């Protein structure tokens, strides 16, 4: 039982989380508005999401009237400029720019002419990129790869592409002119104002004329009605704004009647036992007991990996998922930069490259910086606890984002159990299993992993005694940070034997849990063996087998790149009812990581090949999926609102 002092300390920590979360939300909103990025705020995203379908419909209706000859000459004049742009793209661009300009802190930003010009310019920029895509698709793709992600902002990206296209003698884009841009922007702004008039309301935006000296200037301003919506969205966001950290005492138990986890959660209701679930559903006793059980496991920081991380952060050295901010120095200026035009151009180009790299460093290092902030807060805490909850599928997830067993390789390496287990011969085998698996032998038979660990005592000794000096020995392995933690634990518990208790976490993972469950439901022995439900001489790899089956049916240009990584997310998610649309994204992203661009047609063929391969390799689970889909469709047609069934087990 926690003492009153410990409870007070935890309540104070949660109040700090609430305070800091609110401050971060408000500071982030304020910073985005200062930078004219209100479209990225919480209220901006929610509002655009709500208004976008109505605006798309209005633009489509207007386009249809063109073909019916019902629009005036004024619209036909600007229609030519967006003829190649689908209504969804035009609507998204117009809404983004409207929110950015109207809620910007910059003086005059919300003048009607300024807003219309910004919308028209952004639409022209998009059309210009599509023009380059039609004229020189291969060149544009190369330029994007080499320059796009290095640039600091949207405008700079476009400028880079324009400059490089001009150097390649691509026919120059014929600019629309400011007058036409403003006309186009004004029409889209009118569409936004009209579309926001829900149920004959006053709408979200209106034109407001101000007399400034001898001039009359029109501004676009939010209506009182929208300000009420904005305040409501922000108030709702603040309920979920508190930061989520580990707890200093055991989390409250979850029940069907009371919220668990954080002490103040019962009052704040910021976290549900089932995320995105139906609040009317009653959860069973077994899953609730499971959730409450894992919340009582005490953890602490691993002083060895924390010390190594702090030193590498000081050195600015990247290792695996540990990405500290690396400072890129500007090149020295040439002595004749003032007189020598070529030297000046070369310097400016090199300086821009360095500035682009530095800009990306801050983004890239975000998770590492936040993890190290959490480390500083909990470094001197003897033990802490993780509150957990379910998602709507029944999978358990930690509520905090950092210092949890489901973190990155680096994040996981920072944790050990607060209470150790006495070393036994079985414990030695499990430590050997962990150090070999994280080194990269995760597909090797168990005996091979144990043997490898026994043959590499010298490696573990070198790494444990001088991890920084021997960085090349461990930075390139499969999971470098967990390997580092395992090597140090194995060294002290087995090689040196100066530790009688081990606190290291040993990770074992299900092989495609969706297929495992469906294999059991279908009593499919071959699939059960393929996903390691049934024992075998060595670990089976379902992803590799599906990839090999699918490869001959993929486009020839894609076949050399097909492997388990390309199909993994598809095979993992199909048992959870993932459809071809999401499959396309997974395969496209996996190929992009290999530097491979795939056309729409080839992507369609590849997705079909992978799904057909699953029908061949895992027929039982796929048949169960098909049966469930058919039964659900039949039930919906019959008017059912929910389904209940019993599994064969």
Residue spans of the language-model regions?
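Non-catalytic nucleic-acid-binding interfaces of large nucleic-acid enzymes and RNP effectors
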Residues: 1-571, 575-649
């Amino acid at each position: 039982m926690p003492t009153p002092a410990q409870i007070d300390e935890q309540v104070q920590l949660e109040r700090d989380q609430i305070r800091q979360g609110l401050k971060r939300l408000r500071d982030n909103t304020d910073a985005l508005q200062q930078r004219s990025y209100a479209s990225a705020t919480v209220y901006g995203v929610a509002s655009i999401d709500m208004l976008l379908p109505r605006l798309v419909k209005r633009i489509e209706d207007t386009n249809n009237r063109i073909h019916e000859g019902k629009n005036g000459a004024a619209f036909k004049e600007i229609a030519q400029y967006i003829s190649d742009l689908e209504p969804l793209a035009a609507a998204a661009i117009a809404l983004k720019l409207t929110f950015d300009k109207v809620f910007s802190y910059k003086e005059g930003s919300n003048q009607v002419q300024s807003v219309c010009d910004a919308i028209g310019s952004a639409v022209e920029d998009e059309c210009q990129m599509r023009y380059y895509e039609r004229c020189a698709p291969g060149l544009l793709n190369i330029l994007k790869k080499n320059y796009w992600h290095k640039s600091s902002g949207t405008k700079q990206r476009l400028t880079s592409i324009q400059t490089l296209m001009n150097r390649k003698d691509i026919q120059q884009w014929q600019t629309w002119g400011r007058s036409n841009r403003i006309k186009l922007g004004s029409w889209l702004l009118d569409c936004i104002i009209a579309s926001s008039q829900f149920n004959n309301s006053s709408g979200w935006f209106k034109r407001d004329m101000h007399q400034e000296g001898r001039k009359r200037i029109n501004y676009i301003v939010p209506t009182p009605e929208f300000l009420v919506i904005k305040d409501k969205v922000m108030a709702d966001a603040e309920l979920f704004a508190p930061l989520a950290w580990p707890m200093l005492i055991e989390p409250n138990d979850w029940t069907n009647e009371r919220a668990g986890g954080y002490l103040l959660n019962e009052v704040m209701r910021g976290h549900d036992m089932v995320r995105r679930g139906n609040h009317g559903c009653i959860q069973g006793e077994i899953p609730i007991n499971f959730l409450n059980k894992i919340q009582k496991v005490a953890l602490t920081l691993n002083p060895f990996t924390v010390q190594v991380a702090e030193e590498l952060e000081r050195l600015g050295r990247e290792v695996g998922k540990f990405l500290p901010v690396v400072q890129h120095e500007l090149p020295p200026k040439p002595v004749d930069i003032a007189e020598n035009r070529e030297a000046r151009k070369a310097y400016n180009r090199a300086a821009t490259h360095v500035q682009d790299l530095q800009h990306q460093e801050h983004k890239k290092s975000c998770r590492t910086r936040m993890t190290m902030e959490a480390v500083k807060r909990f470094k001197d805490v003897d033990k802490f606890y993780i509150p957990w909850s379910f998602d709507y599928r029944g999978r358990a997830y930690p509520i905090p984002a950092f210092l949890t067993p489901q973190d990155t390789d680096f994040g996981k390496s920072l944790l050990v159990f607060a209470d150790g287990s006495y070393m036994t011969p079985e414990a030695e085998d499990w430590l050997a299993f962990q150090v070999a698996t994280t080194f990269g032998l995760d597909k090797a038979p168990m005996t091979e992993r144990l043997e490898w660990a026994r043959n590499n005592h010298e490696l573990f000794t070198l790494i444990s005694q001088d991890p920084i000096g021997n960085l090349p020995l461990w930075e390139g392995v499969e999971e470098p940070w967990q390997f580092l933690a395992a090597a140090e634990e194995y060294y002290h518990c087995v090689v040196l034997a100066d530790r009688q208790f081990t606190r290291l976490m040993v990770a074992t993972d299900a092989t495609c849990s969706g297929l495992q469950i469906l294999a059991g439901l279908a009593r499919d022995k071959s699939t059960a063996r393929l996903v390691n439900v049934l024992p075998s001489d060595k670990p089976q790899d379902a992803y590799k087998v599906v990839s090999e089956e699918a490869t001959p049916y993929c486009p020839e240009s894609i076949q050399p790149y097909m492997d388990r990584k390309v199909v993994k997310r598809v095979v993992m998610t199909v048992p959870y009812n993932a459809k071809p649309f999401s499959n396309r994204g997974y395969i496209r992203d996996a190929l992009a990581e290999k530097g491979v661009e795939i056309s729409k047609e080839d992507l369609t063929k590849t997705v079909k090949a992978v799904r057909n391969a699953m029908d061949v390799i895992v027929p039982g689970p796929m048949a169960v999926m098909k049966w469930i889909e058919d039964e659900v469709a039949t039930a919906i047609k019959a008017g059912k609102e929910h389904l209940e069934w019993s599994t064969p087990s």
